[in-house]
Amino acid sequence: MNSSTVNRVTLVGYCGETPEMIYIKSTGNPVCNFRVATHKNYKNKEGVNFEATIWHKVSAWNNLAEYVAENVKKGSKLYIEGELSTSSYTTPQGVRKDSVSIQISELKVL
């Protein structure tokens, strides 16, 4: 096992929707899923400045999910630390889809 790897994400961005808390049927654990927007500035070939919005899927679990549900609203500026998590599923048409999200370990409303 290689212990010299890192899976860590830090975001400062804006909540794009009011988080909804759901409960996992098998465990009863709460989770809040929502999206956070960050922005990237760049210049095109002609030197014109543009701003691109990048959307990140994020999830908060258990006590952190309850905190998010009570304190985070659409438009809230957030500081988030967490790790990337991947999952995959197969569509009814038999196509495999992969999804990446950020599992939040620390969140502050700024």
Task: Give each language-model segment a name.
Residues 1-110:
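Single-stranded nucleic acid-binding surfaces, predominantly the OB-fold ssDNA-binding core
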